[in-house]
């Protein structure tokens, strides 16, 4: 990946609330299925904004920090997804999204960020990201001290 796109906590909340607005009215949803781990924080924000208390997870491993690898389903939520929002932070090449679509064909699949290769696989997203850009999520970063340029 050539470029980086840094996401702050504030940006993530703004984008997730924008997505929640599009998912109203909340009464149409039975619950939320968060794709672990990237979808966990966005799912919490959606659950709050939509007043949804039923939140489940599907646990799929496809990344090792910044490298994609083979998909492995560690845990799945029951059913075909009917009446559920499935949320992940990002749709990238579409590998995880394809597996999600197969598991939950009747779910409404949304992400905060979408790259061109994966866009056709989601029902809605908020932010377009170029394919060659790595997203640094706020839960993967920490604020650290940086010495002044003068060295004093």
UniProtKB/Swiss-Prot annotation:
Its main location: membrane. Transmembrane segments: none annotated. Mg(2+) binds at residue 89. GMP binds at residues 69, 92-96, 134-135. GO terms for molecular function: guanine phosphoribosyltransferase activity; hypoxanthine phosphoribosyltransferase activity; magnesium ion binding; xanthine phosphoribosyltransferase activity. Belongs to the purine/pyrimidine phosphoribosyltransferase family. XGPT subfamily. HAMAP family: XGPRT. Purine salvage pathway enzyme that catalyzes the transfer of the ribosyl-5-phosphate group from 5-phospho-alpha-D-ribose 1-diphosphate (PRPP) to the N9 position of the 6-oxopurines guanine and xanthine to form the corresponding ribonucleotides GMP (guanosine 5'-monophosphate) and XMP (xanthosine 5'-monophosphate), with the release of PPi. To a lesser extent, also acts on hypoxanthine. This is Xanthine-guanine phosphoribosyltransferase. It comes from Yersinia pestis.
